[in-house]
Amino acid sequence: MLRYTLRQLEYFVAVGQTGSIARAADKVNVSSPSISAAITQLEQEFGLPLFVRQHAQGLSLTLAGRQMMEQARVVLREADALTDLAGNISGTVRGPLAIGCLLSFAQLVLPALRRGFVTAYPDVRVRQIELNQAEIFSTLRRAEVDVALTYDLDLPRDLRFVPITELPPYVIVAETHPLAHLPSVTVEALAGHPMVLLDLPFSSEYFLSFFDRIGVRPHIAERTRDMAVMRSLVANGFGYSIANVQPLIAQSPDGKPLKFIPITGEVRPMRMGLLMSSDADRANVVRAFVEYCHGLKADGELPGQEAGE
């Protein structure tokens, strides 16, 4: 008779992945004592030390712990598959759904999207994680997320992309910027002005490709990996930036006004969509999420869609 639960295995895997009880507690949204108790109970049940406790460095998996964690992940995947099978047979949508989202637009798109989905499907337990493009690829391959909301940037062949909407690029400037009065702007017009580059894997290459096409190097004055920091730098006069998803409110996080100007000329729009493994939508919950996103696009209610209209 089993004396441990799937929940305890989930906590064990979370600690193994993060190397910290506190970070694992944040990841699975429970208290640290609950995580500690689960690990202690599993070690007692298995008769094995799963972790080496190092006060300065957190927890490290023992050799036995690494082997047990790999098997625990298999058990959890099989349990999810059993839930999916039950849903497919009954036609219900329920169970866990791990959603990855690209860092550059997660704050603008994911919370409202998630709220609407869990309202429509209250029996689904959603977990979200914000990632850069390279991390999205790796977490999908490791089955740490079921589906990821991202752009069609350098997509690998072993993952399947379902496009949802197309978002042309636009320039972000402060109201006092010399280009702020223009109804549209060309890449050539940007070349002589300082740029605040959103410096994320694959995203930065996309933005810089606009200048490669015309044989010009942009004047990169600032680099940041954070969308909110980028908007604040722009609003405070450090330069212009480029993005594809537009916030509803035309101001920076520190309250200063911004202008959003479409870019004209030969610039490739970005396609936002859902990236997943080739067979991911065999699960009812993933298929329901894909259909839900398509429905929002059709109704003109997809967050961030305003920039592409």
Can you say where each PLM-predicted feature lies in the sequence?
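Alpha-helical linker/hinge and terminal dimerization helices associated
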Residues: E45-F46, M68-S90
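Hydrophobic hinge/microswitch elements
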Residues: N132-F137, R141-V145, T150-Y151, F202-I261
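Secondary-structure junction motif
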Residues: P194-I214, I249, R282-Y292, D299-Q305
